[in-house]
Amino acid sequence: MGWSCIMLFLAATATGVHSQVQLQQPGAELVKPGASVKLSCKASGYTFTSYWMHWVKQRPGRGLEWIGRIDPNSGGTKYNEKFKSKATLTVDKPSSTAYMQLSSLTSEDSAVYYCAR
């Protein structure tokens, strides 16, 4: 069997009228099937703990799928049932960074992932 990999593209979006609000994610990730990956989303320009952080998936040619959200203040999470065993959302308050860990990766996980305030 040949070596294969999974490509994850990362993007970010922020709502609101303040142009200084930024959500920064690194570029693409290349991982092996069965592995896990931790995606990051660093926020700036607003009070990180005042807004939920959402994560969304978009596969080529398909619509957006809401994965879940986390309250950076309390750490409380809510997940789309479909992603409960796939995604784990966490935050690091001191660095104003949200994380999403995806486990047991398959070709179905090859997508663009957005963090959104």
From Swiss-Prot:
It holds the Pfam family V-set. Residues 1-19 form the signal peptide. The keyword Manganese does not apply. Residues 20-49 are annotated as: Framework-1. GO terms for cellular component: extracellular region; immunoglobulin complex. Keywords: Adaptive immunity, Disulfide bond, Immunity, Immunoglobulin, Signal. It comes from Mus musculus (Mouse). Coiled coil: none annotated. CDD domains: IgV_H. SMART domains: IGv. It comes from the Eukaryota. Disulfide bonds join C41-C115. Residues 86-117 are annotated as: Framework-3. InterPro entries: Ig-like_dom, Ig-like_dom_sf, Ig-like_fold, Ig_V-set, IgHV. This is Ig heavy chain V region 1-72. Residues 55-68 are annotated as: Framework-2. Residues 50-54 are annotated as: Complementarity-determining-1. The gene is Ighv1-72. GO terms for biological process: adaptive immune response. Residues 69-85 are annotated as: Complementarity-determining-2.
